[in-house]
């Protein structure tokens, strides 16, 4: 999830498992549907909780550097104290504490036009100049919030004192074993047993320190030491080492920390690291990291969504795709295509999100294509800034999206009521982008087939629908098994929802597979297990995220898959 000046006034998770009754709702009021399946009662189960000044974790910490002493001034709107001169904050940034010279614009809730996107964090202006405003310590005065909060969020004083004076317990997560639902017997061919290849995958938004410093109002519930990079980094590395995933897809990886600390630490643990920084001088990016003893790198393909001269593609988000070869001397295994991305946050720019996703899917289709025109197994991980069962989510899983008359603000499902009346244009992205409405490069089709498809392509650009050819399934069900409550992957002072996913090419017979979208065993993956997510009650007990044990405002997703050997030729 993007942390920025324009945070959701009505950020929500308007999704839930069908048939679940809302017990102890997390969010302050019911949310409208996005106008697509599942039915209204499904979406009504999800709520959003945010009410500044009433959340138990929104009391601002005293940002005092341990080695600094200076007078502070009280800012208007009851903002927390900060140094009077922002240009003296450079020493704070070097040590990883909060104040930051890079600034933020006011919330897009104060913008003149609801059709205009909110400005990006530290985004260059049209003249190429970077804003020098001070960090945003509190949400804008005019920002809106839901009408109410759960009872446990209203009792600020007692909970706050308890959490600030006593140790916070560790968040308990258990492993969900699904292996008994998979066909575990090894295949037998020509008298030889061919054992499958099992491996683990993690997706984790580790929270860039620069973005944290730019958006301190999101972390008022935290004690300042919790937010110090000198404390966060050891926790994050310890977490990565503890889970020891064979493949890790990380988002919000800050480039200087990556080069100086993260990459050396992980390389010492036997990992190979690939990194792609966001464009436009942004400080963070995406990384794909894998164990050298389990995989070898076939190719690496960074994806930049920024396209000069294409107004829709003027944002600096990126993706990173690697093609990996499993290392097993005894059997022949298919390559695995691993994609990692962090899509645009802005809830009102679903058109940009879909265009970014289309570019990523086009590159995945190219990289994963096999000589027989089929595709190797695909893993698609990342922070998609979209909730389950939103139109963007359904597009990934169902391979098609009919968007005729769809409001742009409903694409990601992040907001209850989209502001503005803009709907998705037909087509969403221009032909000059070079991506067809089937999310493939237009020059990817062979010349012999191109003439037969020219008319179809022309017609597709006038239809209000998009498609892709990948068969993808979510590794998580998005509701808790015991209570049916919504799973949470990200949580801070203003929201708690699911935006992080691991999608995969499900093999026939996989526990999460949709039968019509399943792949042959050697061209797909079977889900063996996953690290369970948590809900509202569990986060309440640990004072939300980040905390002294969990150093990001996201939780890591961790799964284990099985790849079956290829048949002998």
Swiss-Prot record:
Coiled coil: none annotated. Residues 63-72 have a biased composition (Polar residues). GO terms for biological process: 3'-UTR-mediated mRNA stabilization. Pfam families: Exo_endo_phos. InterPro entries: CCR4/nocturin_mRNA_transcr, Endo/exonu/phosph_ase_sf, Endo/exonuclease/phosphatase. One of its GO terms (molecular function) is mRNA 3'-UTR binding. Signal peptide: none annotated. Residues 139-150 have a biased composition (Low complexity). Residues 1-22, 63-92, 109-155 are annotated as: Disordered. SUPFAM superfamilies: DNase I-like (SSF56219). It comes from the Eukaryota. PANTHER family: CARBON CATABOLITE REPRESSOR PROTEIN 4, PROTEIN ANGEL HOMOLOG 2. Belongs to the CCR4/nocturin family. This is Protein angel homolog 2. It comes from Danio rerio (Zebrafish).
């Amino acid at each position: 999830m993007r942390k920025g000046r324009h945070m959701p006034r009505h950020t929500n998770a308007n999704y839930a498992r069908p048939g679940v009754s809302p017990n102890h709702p997390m969010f302050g009021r019911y949310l409208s549907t996005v106008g697509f399946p599942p039915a209204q009662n499904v979406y009504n189960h999800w709520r959003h909780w945010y009410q500044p000044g009433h959340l138990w974790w929104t009391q601002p910490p005293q940002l005092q550097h341990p080695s600094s002493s200076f007078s502070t001034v009280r800012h208007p709107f009851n903002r927390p104290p900060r140094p009077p001169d922002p240009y003296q904050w450079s020493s704070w940034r070097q040590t990883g504490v909060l104040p930051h010279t890079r600034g933020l614009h006011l919330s897009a809730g104060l913008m003149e036009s609801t059709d205009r996107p909110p400005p990006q964090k530290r985004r260059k202006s049209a003249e190429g100049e970077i804003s020098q405003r001070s960090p945003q310590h509190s949400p804008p005065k005019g920002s809106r919030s839901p009408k109410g909060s759960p009872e446990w969020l209203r009792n600020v004083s007692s909970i706050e004192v308890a959490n600030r004076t006593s140790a916070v317990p560790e968040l308990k997560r258990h492993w969900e074993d699904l292996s008994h639902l998979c066909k575990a017997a090894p295949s037998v061919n020509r008298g030889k047993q061919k054992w499958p290849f099992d491996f683990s995958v993690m997706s984790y938004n580790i929270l860039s320190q620069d973005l944290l410093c730019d958006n301190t109002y999101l972390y008022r519930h935290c004690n300042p030491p919790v937010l110090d990079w000198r404390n966060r980094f050891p926790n994050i590395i310890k977490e990565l080492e503890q889970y020891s995933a064979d493949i890790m897809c990380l988002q919000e990886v800050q480039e200087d920390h990556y080069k100086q600390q993260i990459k050396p630490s992980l390389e010492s643990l036997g990992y190979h690291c690939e990194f792609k920084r966001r464009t436009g001088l942004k400080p963070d990016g995406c990384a794909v990291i894998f164990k050298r003893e389990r995989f070898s790198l076939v190719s690496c393909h960074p994806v930049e969504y920024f396209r000069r001269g294409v107004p829709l593609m003027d944002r600096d988000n990126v993706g990173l795709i690697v093609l990996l070869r499993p290392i097993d001397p005894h059997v022949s295994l298919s390559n695995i295509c691993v994609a990692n991305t962090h899509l645009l946050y802005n809830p009102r720019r679903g058109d940009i999100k879909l265009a970014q996703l289309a570019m990523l899917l086009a590159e995945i289709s190219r990289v994963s294509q096999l000589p027989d025109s089929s595709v190797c197994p695909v893993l698609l991980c990342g922070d998609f800034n979209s909730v389950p069962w939103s139109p963007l989510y359904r597009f990934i899983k169902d391979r098609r999206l009919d968007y005729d008359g769809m409001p742009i603000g409903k694409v990601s499902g992040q907001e209850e009521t989209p502001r503005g009346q803009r709907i998705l244009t037909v087509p969403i992205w221009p032909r000059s982008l070079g991506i067809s409405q089937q999310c493939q490069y237009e020059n990817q089709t062979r010349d012999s087939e191109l003439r037969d498809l020219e008319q179809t392509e022309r017609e597709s650009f006038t239809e209000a629908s998009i498609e892709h050819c990948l068969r993808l399934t979510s590794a998580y069900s998005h509701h808790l098994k015991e209570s049916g409550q919504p799973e949470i992957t990200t949580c801070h002072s203003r929201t708690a929802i699911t935006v992080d996913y691991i999608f995969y090419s499900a093999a026939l017979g996989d526990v999460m597979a949709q039968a019509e979208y399943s792949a042959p065993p050697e061209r797909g993956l079977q889900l063996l297990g996953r690290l369970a997510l948590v809900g509202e009650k569990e986060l309440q007990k640990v004072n939300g995220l980040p905390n002294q044990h969990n150093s990001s405002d996201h939780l890591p997703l961790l799964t284990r898959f099985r790849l079956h050997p290829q048949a002998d030729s």
